[in-house]
Amino acid sequence: MAILEQTLCLLKKDSKLLLALGKKGFNAGKYNGVGGKIRKNETPDQAMVRKVKEEIGVTPTSYGKVGYLEFDEYYEGEKRRIAMHLYIASEWDGDPMETNMFIPHWFHISDSPYEKMFPDDKYWLPLILKGKKIRAYFDYDKDWNVLYKDIYNMNQNVSVVIDGQAGSCGKGKICGYLSQIDQYKISTNNWSSNAGHTYVDNKGRKIVVSHLPMAIVNPDTIVCINAGAIITPEILFKEIKEYKDLLGKRKVYVHPRAMVIQQKHRDYEMASIRSGSTFKGCGAALADKIMRKKDIILAKDYFSNVHNSKIEIMDTAMLLNNEIGKILVEGAQGQDLDINYGLDYPNVTSRMCSAAQIIADAGLSVFGVKDIYMIIRPYPIRISNETNIGKTINSGDYAGSQEITWEEVAKRSGFKGNFEEYTTVTKKKRRVFEMNWDRLKYNVMINKPTQIVLNFAQYIDYRAYNCKDYAKLPKKVKDFIKRIEEETSVPVTIIGTGENEEDIIDLRKLKLNT
């Protein structure tokens, strides 16, 4: 869905507010602020000043941005999304005048004519008149009824996606879905080459990445790799080449302090590590970065010598913190693999995988976070005890849960085929375990997710496969969801029922409507 960027300005003097009565078109008979479309190569501030002068004959000289509104609405029978930069002006040159579009009127702020305004105005206008800066989203039906609304602090524009178990819960699918449905302006990650992320579009195309954010599937989302990333350049180059059609004209912004993996890091891990590992050199590279060794290579050094026209070195923290639009932070691996709070050390990964760590690696504040999506599956997994270099290791158990077979999972679900899963990076068969409710509650305690996403619902009952309607989900799946919510006190808002992007049931508007 394309986004139409607009501005809206309200003139305020002491306890009075200027609203303009529309004379024709979309605004006819409605009171509103004044504004309109942002032209190409025009900033929101420039567009706001221009439109106020055009529509009521004054030029704002002292003003501030107080909000960012998004609307999904119908226009000429088609759904469209409006993104509106909201301003209040306290000083201006000239006197408000009637034009061919509007008739300006002054109101006391306590007498705002909400009955003659758009239905959403009554929700957000009182807040900004009290001095609050807000972000809001409204979903309208064809009759201009508000179906769903979400209003929150303007500075809370960050959503985080984490894995609530030991990885392979379908983060790639959910990040791709969210990036398109929720229209994120920027997506960032701290990934390394020891984990892969998969997304399957509706045409069956499989996108698999270890470095590029999965938000590449949205052509309007800026993508960046932050300072917490540990990069294998060959893999990044391969992904840029393979998905050049998805990237289009976009750059991939990389923080100068992202770490680069060298062959010595892979060699060291193959010679030294005896616990579960992909032997991609990620842990060894991170250790060298922590020790500030002289022979390390950071992204700023590597990419200044090895040119790729798609990569641009940039302070991604500045990029993210200067963005007022929605930001998606894509996590990797899983909380059960966290080096400090994961399962059985040393059968963990080389760093923390919590929401707090992912946010810190992005260079963002926790106070900017609005949502944390924790992705889980009904049967958690661990990697194979057989490595991709021929070694047999102990990849760990699952907090005492019984290890079962993929045949047993299929039997319980009523599926006659084979559910066997293989890891994206090493191509080894995953081990599968019974759900551990105590472990899930522990991971919820660590991360405090606002929402839980349940993927692989078809593993509970195969009749859920490809289901897109909650009402049609088998009772067995609904009962499982109910137990998740009872055990964690966190709503299950998204349900994955298959591999493809369309195999999703999104309950957010139902469960989170405020």
Role assignments for model-derived ranges:
Residues 1, 12, 52, 65-70, ...:
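A broadly structural signal marking compact, well-ordered functional cores
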Residues 38-64, 71-128, 147-153:
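Unchanged
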Residues 155-514:
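Non-transmembrane, aqueous-exposed alpha-helical and coiled segments at domain scale
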Residues 1-32, 60-64:
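N-terminal strand-loop-strand
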Residues 31-36, 331:
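Conserved acetyl-CoA binding element of GNAT-fold acetyltransferases
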Residues 17-19, 146, 336:
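Hydrophobic "anchor" residues
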Residues 130-155:
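Charged phosphate-binding loop/patch that engages nucleotide di/tri-phosphates or the phosphate backbone
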